[in-house]
Amino acid sequence: MSFAPNASHSPVFLLLGFSRANISYTLLFFLFLAIYLTTILGNVTLVLLISWDSRLHSPMYYLLRGLSVIDMGLSTVTLPQLLAHLVSHYPTIPAARCLAQFFFFYAFGVTDTLVIAVMALDRYVAICDPLHYALVMNHQRCACLLALSWVVSILHTMLRVGLVLPLCWTGDAGGNVNLPHFFCDHRPLLRASCSDIHSNELAIFFEGGFLMLGPCALIVLSYVRIGAAILRLPSAAGRRRAVSTCGSHLTMVGFLYGTIICVYFQPPFQNSQYQDMVASVMYTAITPLANPFVYSLHNKDVKGALCRLLEWVKVDP
């Protein structure tokens, strides 16, 4: 990452994502502070409940606990810095920190999408082969699937970093590179670059699309088989129970993959800065916020564990 050839130092990026917003920075600060604190509180509570209550020591909740940790990481990569910039009114970030944020954002973000796909596989085994569910989706296998998700994600992220490192940027009179976003993401970095970015744009579209093809295919095939299995169930109560176990996961699949496709897998000429901003807020702030509530509000096991924990706290202060 460097300035144009006649520059002698690393670029400093000026994050201008909310500079044109018709909302005061104070209001934005308290809005994102509330989102971040609620995200951390919700996901920490879910992690503690799953770890504490033996009734939640099943493969589904093991994966859900891993997803909650990832969601906290994804929010922490972007939102604390955004809050600091909203307070300072001078949202600069040096090249090294920008690259670090870029790396960790993709590491957590891609892992998030892969774990969501693994959870679809878990639901498939639970509904289509319930007698062997505990054997097939044991904790060791779940741990291996989580580890594999991290390995694939980090390899993908290293490729993205490798595409960004050779790029050059031209600074303004103050030596800053204007970045039309609220954190260091791939497309805004490309738009601000003075290098030829055609190969980068193609890599985002095709390599990223290829990476998402596997998880998307796994999710679709899992739910096709799940749907067929549900239709074969003899009782309406059994069908409702099976559908309820998948409803939360399907909600987050649509939410997460919808925003990712909206930002990263449209042809460059159809992609706008405003569209990137809105979808990125949904992906980095709203999705991690929603996950613990979507998975717990309609889940009797989680609500029961929360009630037992509160009773235990009252009895043993």
Curated annotation (Swiss-Prot):
Name of the coding gene: OR1B1
GO molecular function: G protein-coupled receptor activity; olfactory receptor activity
Keyword Membrane in record: yes
Glycosylation site list: N6, N22
Disulphides: C98-C184
Function: Odorant receptor.
Topology of the protein relative to the lipid bilayer: Multi-pass membrane protein
Gene Ontology CC: one annotated term: plasma membrane
Sequence intervals crossing the membrane: 30-50, 67-87, 99-119, 145-165, 202-222, 249-269, 277-297
Main location group: membrane
Organism: Homo sapiens (Human)
Extracellular face of the membrane: 1-29, 88-98, 166-201, 270-276
Gene3D superfamilies hit by this protein: Rhodopsin 7-helix transmembrane proteins (1.20.1070.10)
Stored PANTHER family: OLFACTORY RECEPTOR
Residues in the Cytoplasmic compartment per record: 51-66, 120-144, 223-248, 298-317
Coiled-coil segments: none
BP terms from Gene Ontology: signal transduction
Pfam families in the cross-refs: 7tm_4 (PF13853)
Family: Belongs to the G-protein coupled receptor 1 family.
Name of the protein: Olfactory receptor 1B1
Subcellular location: Cell membrane
